[in-house]
Amino acid sequence: MIEIQDLVVRYGSATALHGVSLRVHPQEMVALIGANGAGKSTLVNAISGILPAVQGRVRLGGVLAHVPEGRQLFGGLTVEDNLQLGAWRFPSRRRDMQWVFDLLPELERIRRLRADQLSGGQQQMIAVGRALMSRPQVLAIDELSLGLAPKVVATLAQALRDLNAREGTAVLLIEQNARLALSLCTRAYVLEAGKVVKEAAAQELLHSEFVEDAYLGRSPEELV
């Protein structure tokens, strides 16, 4: 569970988030969509404690894991070693990676390869798998699909569905790819210029003129 109330984040004198409130219920998948510069990454970094807030409150129910934009792997380490780093707070879980392999079988096949030898899609799978090693109650993912082929995006999307169904893990999906995010999630928020301008059921937003005009103008092939 995530509960955010009236969150304000500033970079120097510039305000990046203006009193944002948002909630992710246990076992829920929620999308946060918006254009570049809307404040999506700032929000997830504030939720995970990377950025300080000058006002407001963030309340978490259980362990939060964060998949940052850009993957941030250790290229010289193997897939297995990168995964184990995800359980650094929970040493007893470092060898418990079979359940991650069950969600993302490709990781088991490449487990002994170095991360810098792999494709962008495989590296994104590692980043997601590493976050899951802590067995989180809440998973926040920043730009899951960025720069990835449709087949890889489909694999990762199915893994999130399976994770939510099997483990009951709540997911906050921060995405520019609105069609993907709204198709995966049950509820969604739209962020513009650091403010939540709309909250609704994901399917309602998917078929609304508001989102269609602003975020769904590209073809399904471009948006996956």
Regions found by a protein language model. Give the residues of each.
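The feature captures the beta-strand-to-loop junction immediately N-terminal to the Walker
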Residues: 33-35
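Helix-to-loop junction immediately C-terminal to a conserved catalytic motif
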Residues: 48
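Conserved ABC transporter NBD signature motif
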Residues: 55-64, 95
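Conserved ABC ATPase signature
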Residues: 114-118, 122
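ABC ATPase C-loop
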Residues: 131-132
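Helical segment within the ABC ATPase nucleotide-binding domain
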Residues: 154-168
